[in-house]
Amino acid sequence: DHFIFGGCRDWRKPIKILVAGGGTGDALIMIAQLLKNRAVPAEIHYIDPAKASRKIAEDRAHFRGLDHINFHTTSLENAADFGPFDYIDCCGVLHHLPDPEYGFRALSNALAPSGGMGLMVYAPYGRRGVYELQNAFSALVADLSPREKVVVAKKVLRNLPKTAALASNPWVADHKNGDAGLYDLLLHSRDQPFTVERIRDALAQADLRLAGWVEPGRYDPKLLINDQSVSQRVDHLSYWKRAALAEQLAGNIKTHRFYAVLNANTFAPPVFCPESVPVIHNAPADKLAKSIAQTGKLSFTVNGLTFSHKLDRASADLVRHMTGKMTAGEIVAKANLNWEFGLKRLSGLSLYLGNFNHLRFSRFFADQDQTV
């Protein structure tokens, strides 16, 4: 809602959704259950080429009584056959395709003119060490069965040289969480990671544009450069160059999570107005408000990097009411502030909280419980 519909979608209206590369159904079930809880008239489609994964997803849907899902055993390259879609969810899939850029184009062709998609692709720098070992294991265990590959890989990892890049990468631990995680990370057919600039090019080739990063603060190099004289040198760079610089400086981005819309889509990011409905995301609003009141700041730690921002008590009073149940105008009135002063506070909060995936605009939960 926030990234594609500006936080203003009327959820009483029908919506058509595709989960592309749905696997065993994690994203599918979450989306379908939320829409069912909200009584949204939804038509949901699932696409995945693996019959075994589809069976698991179907069983999960049946268990929850989610009967508004259409299952298709096919590639996402055929997505347009079932569209057009108002929203496409595709997480952790495109980088596994032989031609990921073609996958971008296939999904773009399946979008409705006013629709958009949520995407996740692997990033290279935060996954340092993964690709070296993928190459190493490809040479070492290519002739073995999957089970034998895991046995050999475990032996290698137990004695992995401390100089290996993966040994010093604290952000990647999939290989420590069971055989499935190990196989998917290091023994799976090699994935193709995306830098910021490769994402830029893939979107352009698919007639798409970026609607927003899930955590835009991680793509702002000025938040990583504390020296003002150096920080000013960022100003002459293009948006994409700045984002690429931040990715390179931080070195800890494992995945890129973002939303995209068609170039012709006139969508604009939501801003505070009296009718907008802000909702704190990824943390209880009252907990964040209490932290602000006690410390006079908000701090977020993301993969080893801590970002802090000073705030005052007035901000705490505003955050406390950002539950998705009240409009911005109602929140400002509840905090006993005039609109001009409240708007200034809200705009500052929106920038900082939004930078780290903690504030969204949406009417989805206005009259509903937020749990799945």
Residue ranges and their predicted role:
Residues 1-15, 30, 34:
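Conserved alpha-helix/loop element of class I SAM-dependent methyltransferases that forms part
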Residues 86-100:
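A short SAM/SAH-binding and catalytic strip from SAM-dependent methyltransferases
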Residues 101-113:
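A short glycine-rich, Lys/Arg-flanked "PGG" loop and its adjoining helix->strand segment in the class I
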Residues 116-166:
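Conserved class I S-adenosyl-L-methionine
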Residues 191-210:
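Short alpha-helix
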Residues 221-260, 304-372:
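Long, charge-rich, low-complexity alpha-helical segments
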